[in-house]
Amino acid sequence: MDVVSSARRGPRQGDVWLVALDPTRGSAIRKTRPCLVVSPDEMNQHIATVIVVPLTTTVRAYPTRIGIHFRGKTGQAALDRIRTVDKARLVKKLGGVPEAAADEVAGVLVEMFTRG
C-alpha cells in the first residue's frame, strides 16, 4: 500500500507522521516534526486524537530515548515527550519504523507506566 492510500485510512501504530506540535508551552518539543504513533489501532480508528512520540536528532543519554533510524537520519524517539494530539495536527504520513523499533518503544512505554 502506498503512502497516499495508507494516509487516507488514518494513523496506525508504528507509523511516522509529520505533526504540527505548535503552539506549545514550557519545555514541550516544538514545531512541525516527525512523530511516531504509539496509540493502538483500535483507538486510532474510533477517537479524534492519537498518542505520539516526537522524533528528534538531538541525542540524549536518557533511558526514555530510543534510537531510531528513519529516512536516512539517525535520531531518537523521545518517549519522555509523549503527547496526545488531535488528528487535525497530522500533516502527512511519512512512513513507518521497523517492527523491532516499534517493539522496543512499546517495551519502554510499559516500563514507564508500570507502577512499582
Regions found by a protein language model. Give the residues of each.
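Conserved functional hotspots at enzyme active or ligand-binding sites that engage polyanionic ligands
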Residues: M1-G116
